[in-house]
């Protein structure tokens, strides 16, 4: 399982009292955090032209820290009058992802109404068809209310069908569910990426809001072995928090490697 990080995690990191420039993010992640992949949130790309996206891709490739998922932060509605705009948005995201070299786009649904479910699914499928020429996958992140119901999301993905539609479950949504194990069992079979949502760590080193290792174990128990993206949305000590999450998750993913590192330090 490959540990990666989201650009949202770095939004409050300062270098010489300034935020990290978008083009410098891959080098920072690879050299300072020791992570080898990025989920780029769409807010990072504001004001960037196509040539800038290609430069970011080149920097990421040179740093061996590729962009794996382009994550849109605005919930999209594929029902009623909003559907056409949402489909255009997905097409724009697909084009941006192709410039970044990202194989997947992740979106959050703003609604998932029980009525006219088939029509809603058909519109999402049309949006997916609009990015097929970019060879881009479309991943659905859990949203609020019915759009966060794992059973409904799984039904939507099955209804759309094909290998280019998938899910992107998050630890935060799983922890908030009535049954986190059921949440993961329903969505992870369709997952092409998983978001390891992170909050603050206590003085003891324990994660305050949910058990990161227990959620990781639940994900692995359903056979998931793809990327796990650390996502920290807080302002306080972002680098230290990311590093704590990285070390905790890395040790759980490969205990033998962690033991070897500890043995070398003891020598």
Model-derived regions: residue spans:
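Acidic/histidine-rich catalytic cores of soluble enzymes
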Residues: 31, 37-38, 126-217
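Conserved, mostly hydrophobic/aromatic
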Residues: 5, 29, 60, 97, ...
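Boundary/entry segment of secreted carbohydrate-active catalytic domains
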Residues: 1-22
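Acidic-and-aromatic substrate-binding clefts and catalytic sites of carbohydrate-active enzymes
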Residues: 15-18, 40-54, 75-85, 111-118, ...
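Short, acidic/polar
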Residues: 15-32, 82-95, 176-186, 212
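Hydrophobic faces of well-ordered beta-strands that scaffold small-molecule active sites
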Residues: 1-8, 36-40, 67-72, 105-107, ...
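Active-site acidic/histidine proton-transfer and metal-coordination neighborhood
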Residues: 59-169, 176, 248, 252, ...
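Catalytic domains of carbohydrate-active enzymes, especially glycoside hydrolases
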Residues: 21-43, 100-101
